[in-house]
Amino acid sequence: MKKTKSAPERNTKTAKKNPHHADRTINILIVGVGGQGVLLASQILSEVALLAGYDVKKSEVHGMSQRGGVVSSHIRIGRKVYSPLIPSGQADVILAFERAEALRWIHELKPDGFLIVNDQQLVPPIAGDKKYVYPENALEILSARLKSLRVVDAARI
């Protein structure tokens, strides 16, 4: 029988002592395609926040992840979080593991939100369909629309 690992408990002692805990909920959206580590990154971030004493809620969509499909994870961190889903247009941070996914999800970012995007281009299997056009200029479009954008060559990290 396979043992399953349970999520860490919220560290309530830290939560009470830490004066830096925000009174508001921080909304982080991690997006990419299957196999990039979106689910692992969201799990690590959630566990670290729990251990730091925050309340954390997380929701994932990974239906076609094994076939290079879209993968997304909503992570909400705060003193008390009631829902795992980030309200539309209210992401404080979007961490995009792929350029086109950054462009696909940019409407979920707050006007003063911050986008971190990997400079990687992964053309999905659907690109073989002549109706699909991969946005070659995704970074230029994002740069023109956002004040807070950081492009990272994650393969070098």
For each feature predicted by the language model, list its residue ranges:
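Active-site cofactor/cluster-binding pocket
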Residues: 2-5, 13-157
